[in-house]
Amino acid sequence: MYKRQHLFQNCYFREKNKHPLRYVLNFPAYTEGYATYAEIYSYQFLDATKEEIDILQNNAISTHCLYALCDIGIHAKHWNQKKLSDFLANHGIVTADNAKAIYETIIDSPGSYLPYTIGYLEICRIRDTFQKSAGKNYTPLLFHTFLLDIGPTSFPVLERQINGWLKEKT
């Protein structure tokens, strides 16, 4: 599912945005956050009960958040493997092998989990603001189209664009 989210996002962006400068700019929190958002959003279309879908969605974002916290702990708070293992044990991951694998994965790629997590959370926050401001005019399609039309950018720019659009429309 992950690669398909990026494929759609990238093809859509290339179709809508022709300015060459846009292709050299990199906004990983938007890009990875969108992929995470699209993945988690897509679970509602599975042939499953609402309870099962909620579990899948909550598990996905909880896992992203847990790994982001581990990333911050290791790289910003200088956790060693023991400290990470203790942290993970408090969150239900109790085997030393699992803790070691997570530590080695995160130590090799500083900051790699944060764009997925922070990007997803920012997109959800912006979506909620958009939904509240748009009121009865809100549809998921409207928000998703707007998000994709703008394309990869910083979240402050995305928010300004959305706020400007909302002022025009409401």
Q: For each predicted feature, which ranges?
A:
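N-terminal maturation segment of proteins
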Residues: 3-170
